[in-house]
Amino acid sequence: MNTYTENEIKTLEWNEHIRRRPGMYIGKLGDGSSPDDGIYVLLKEVMDNSVDEYAMGYGKQIVISISDKVVTVRDYGRGIPLDSLIVAASKMNTGAKYDNKAFKKSVGLNGVGIKAVNALSIDFKIQSYRDGESQMARFSKGILTEQERVLTSEKNGTLVTFLADEELFGNYI
């Protein structure tokens, strides 16, 4: 008897796929005890976006902090276009680095990196500041939980804060 039927064919949402197959996106998971552990890849992916802005001449400062396993990266570049913030953080293969119009230099994964960080984090917050307005989106395991758009006096740029999921990374360093 053949047990391979239509019921065995599954389609995963983008975040489910990343969470089930993180090795495709960040290499091995790891707890930080090895320099190639995925926990460091998450940090690098967020930093790379800020470095791209800096390398293009936008913003002269990148602030990185880690406290109680919460990583925060703030750049003072152009900021992500506000109406594209949620899509940029949660729709696979979406980004501005596929051609050289907006980014002549890029070290990022071109539409994948920040989504992997989002999906592999228990708490992921991204906020863009542009020309007196701010758009914020918060996710848990890649699922949008909160969003807000407000007026602001903050300088242009992007703020990303994340707490990696200990279910996946263990008690990481």
Residue ranges, per PLM feature:
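Short strand->helix junction
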Residues: M24-Y25, G32, E53, R78-G79, ...
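Conserved ATP-binding N-box helix of the HATPase_c
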Residues: S33-I62, G113-L120
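Conserved beta-strand-loop-beta-strand hairpin that lines the nucleotide-binding pocket
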Residues: D48-Y98
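Conserved, well-folded catalytic cores of nucleic-acid-processing
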Residues: R21-Y25, S50-E53, G57, K91-G95, ...
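GHKL-type ATPase core
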Residues: M1-E8, K69-S84, A96-I173
